[in-house]
Design a protein with these regions (language model features):
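Active-site anion-handling motifs in enzyme catalytic cores
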Residues: 1-397
Length: 397
């Protein structure tokens, strides 16, 4: 089949780029021709103002060189024209948080396709989309009904997490079990795509460093500056005493400003970003796809989970040291949903990592076996491959 992928592929964001790449490569590995529909949102352009200029160009270069793209689209009309020209046999939506916003004219619910007399017969399915919001009840009855009507026309639906499944079923289908399949993120399969890639180590030794991703200018102002600096000094001391370097893998928005032994400079290619995580002794820090990449690679990890409940109540619980109670409030977090029920459920804190024990986190990372991380990965991939086989069968009928 010739399959079009409609997802968030353009953002200057490592995870967005890699999930599109992994979906494309997986479909190709199953014998299909896969192209990423180059739909550009206003938000994609906005990233240019938010990230380092060199890093923005690195993401743009990756998308335009590594992804098999269609012509560019910015409207529903463009999408219809491109799909007709490409003569796709099927469209897949996702992965990533493409089902979170009512402000995109239901592009990612394929309303534009279902309304087209010429295209409405093309089968549509989803690959691990997520909602990552407060639900759909804030939308008007008409908006919710329009989304429901679209979903009823999908041939096969998977979502990335339990929160998205429960939210759709509750808010759009009156608690009916309409969505039943939770599908792991495509980036779990990324390790399969790097066998021919060469890591630009910049003088670092494989498994000779701990890797961290912290917020931009983490301790350069705001609250708890002294506590952040002390936490970092303590964690770095544990890492160095054990014989490792502490290396920063900066987020696209900017470097942390902390005194790492080494900071990977921009520009960072998304595949090189993955290889830095793969070759680390352990990873500690921000971002969902950094954690999925660590799992894909068998790298021990600890998540600085900024996606959870950041209410004042949760922050107070963390400041008081009541971390376990605070983490039970994170049901919307994609890290919470990723790790829930696994042996790694406790391998996360919220954004206030400075109130956690640096010694405890270091010990958790040192005691984690790569074999156990790989077992967790392989369980997720087994689910992913089962769902993908069912999805491909559904859209081929």
């Amino acid at each position: 089949m010739k399959i079009g992928i409609l997802t968030f592929h353009r953002p200057a964001n490592f995870g967005a780029n890699l999930q599109a790449y992994c979906s494309m490569r997986y479909l190709q590995s199953q014998g299909h021709e896969a192209k990423v529909i180059d739909y550009v949102r206003a938000g994609d352009i906005g990233y240019k103002k938010q990230v380092d200029a060199r890093q923005y160009e690195a993401h743009k270069h990756f998308v335009e060189i590594r992804l098999n793209l269609t012509k560019q689209a910015t409207t529903s009309e463009d999408l219809c024209r491109i799909v007709e020209e490409e003569r796709f046999d099927a469209i897949v939506v996702g992965a990533d948080a493409v089902w979170r916003s009512p402000n995109d004219a239901n592009i990612y619910f394929a309303e534009w396709l279902f309304k087209s007399p010429k295209l409405s017969a093309i089968p549509v399915a989803s690959i691990s989309p997520a909602h990552m919001g407060n639900g759909f009840m804030a939308l008007s009855d008409e908006q919710r009904e329009a989304i429901k009507k679209c979903l009823l026309q999908f041939k096969y639906i998977t979502v990335r997490d339990e929160w998205t499944k429960e939210t759709i079923n509750r808010d759009l289908f009156n608690c009916e079990e309409f969505v039943t399949h939770v599908n792991p993120d495509p980036v779990f399969t990324m390790y399969r795509n790097v066998n021919e890639e060469i890591w630009d180590s910049r003088g670092r030794k494989r498994k000779g460093y701990y890797l961290m991703s912290l917020p931009k200018n983490w301790a350069c102002g705001g609250k708890f500056v002294a506590k952040k600096k002390q936490w970092f000094a303590d964690f770095k001391a544990y890492v160095n005493k054990a014989g490792y370097e502490l290396v920063e893998l900066p987020i696209p928005e900017g470097k942390s400003g902390m005194p790492f032994d080494y900071t990977v400079d921009y520009p960072i290619d998304p595949i090189q970003w993955f290889l830095w995580i793969k070759n680390a002794k352990a990873f500690c820090g921000l971002r969902f796809h950094a954690i999925v990449s660590a799992i894909s690679s068998g790298t021990p990890f600890y998540s600085m989970d900024s996606y959870g409940d950041n209410s004042r109540k949760s922050q107070i619980l963390d400041i008081l040291g009541l971390h376990k109670i605070a983490r039970t409030r994170d049901v919307r977090s994609k890290i919470y949903n990723l790790l829930k029920g696994s042996s790694f459920e406790s391998h996360r804190c919220n954004a206030l990592i400075e109130f956690e024990s640096a010694k405890r986190i270091f010990k958790a990372l040192e005691s984690t076996r790569s074999e156990d991380v790989l077992m967790f990965r392989d369980r997720n991939i087994a689910v992913f491959e089962k769902n993908m086989a069912e999805m491909l069968n559904a859209v081929s009928k």
